[in-house]
Amino acid sequence: MTIDTAAWPAGRVNSLGFAKPPHETRVVAAMSGGVDSSVVAAMLKAEGYDVIGITLQLYDHGAAIEKKGACCAGQDIHDARNVSDAIGIPHYVLDYESRFREQVMEDFADTYLSGSTPIPCIRCNQTVKFADLLATAKELGADCLATGHYIRRTDGPEGPELHRAQDASRDQSYFLFATTRAQLDFLRFPLGSLPKSEVRELAEKFALQVAAKPDSQDICFVPDGSYAKVVEKLRPGSGRGGEIVHLDGRVLGKHEGVIHYTIGQRRGLGVATGDPLFVVKIDAPARRVIVGPREALMTRGLLLEELNWLGQGSLEEAATHGARVLIRVRSTRPPVPGRLGYEDGVPAVFFDAPEEGVARGQAAVLYDLEGSTRILGGGFIARPLPADERVVAA
């Protein structure tokens, strides 16, 4: 069903926040070929917007055609094109393989080699989707770029704000903390207030061929879940072995490369001591994997880098005054209370109670402590601050 836009009252704001009728509002819909982005395009078209669909070809098109659960490659490009044809909008495919490899895949490999644990989906949003694609949308004369992310954007007193999705089980705020205010001004997230079940129903209502398509899973360019294989392919010779060392200094065994390990890992260590051991630190330059008891995983705080602040006032003011925040260190964990501050002049967050198994390279996302859904920003973890001094000295 379409909306009659023939008579549009002066000053009336459309569903995307513009004071003009939908047919005068150009929207670029980022289409990955999945259900969510397809529903966004169909919804906007049904409301009468001037919609253009764009899909980014991000990696090895040929090898990815048969891969299930990927995005932005192979069959997904065909699906996005077919959906666009079905709903009657123009569709374009932009080849961003080189850009994606340079900004996302190369960074992924180098981050693992440094002993950190990367989050390529954040890098992709930050350096490709919300940078290059957004710029392309503006070049096409679009008023905004709409995506299928489960997150909400609202207009606040200091500009656009980012809020958690209505459906907590689908909330993607952890992966979108790096979105800047300038980007938020141009972005729209039509699914932020909808549960996934309703999105599936809409896909069926619009008779989209992707209505029953599974959600994308894992990292799109890691076909079998083996991160180490991808790193080895991008950085031949990266699997150089070294020692597995206990916190007390004992050498317990050998490993085949730090790229096979992450903080908090217990399985696959290949050492037997009778007591449960976990990876508590990775010394990449020395090629040492340091293990210890579970209590050695506890972290009192985190030094942050590339910090993006979306809260009130400036980051400097918030950190200087020790602003109280909620901190999320993994997408699967609930946020925990703490405060902003500085450690040795570097922006940091400090937990009210020590947090377990926090890895360098992951994200620390900040939320409003006062029960609201607002995302205050976040940063990448430059260095955890261990509660156990043995880990500091190791």
Swiss-Prot record:
Binding site residues for ATP: 30-37, 56, 148
Annotated site, Interaction with tRNA, chain positions: 149, 362
Region Interaction with tRNA: start-end pairs: 170-172
Gene3D superfamilies: Adenine nucleotide alpha hydrolases-like domains, HUPs, Translation factors
EC number(s) recorded for this UniProt protein: 2.8.1.13
Keyword Nucleus: no
Primary localization class, coarse: cytoplasm
Cystine bridges: 124-220
Protein localization: Cytoplasm
Reactions catalysed, as given in the entry: S-sulfanyl-L-cysteinyl-[protein] + uridine(34) in tRNA + AH2 + ATP = 2-thiouridine(34) in tRNA + L-cysteinyl-[protein] + A + AMP + diphosphate + H(+)
Residue numbers annotated as active site: 124 (nucleophile), 220 (cysteine persulfide intermediate)
Keywords: ATP-binding, Cytoplasm, Disulfide bond, Nucleotide-binding, RNA-binding, Transferase, tRNA processing, tRNA-binding
A GO cellular-component term linked to this record: cytoplasm
GO molecular function: ATP binding; tRNA binding; tRNA-uridine 2-sulfurtransferase activity
Pfam families recorded: tRNA_Me_trans, tRNA_Me_trans_C, tRNA_Me_trans_M
Record flagged with keyword Nucleotide-binding: yes
Entries under HAMAP family matching the protein: tRNA_thiouridyl_MnmA
Protein family: Belongs to the MnmA/TRMU family.
NCBIfam families, sorted: PRK00143.1, trmU
Name by which UniProt lists this protein: tRNA-specific 2-thiouridylase MnmA
Organism: Hyphomonas neptunium (strain ATCC 15444)
Gene (UniProt): mnmA
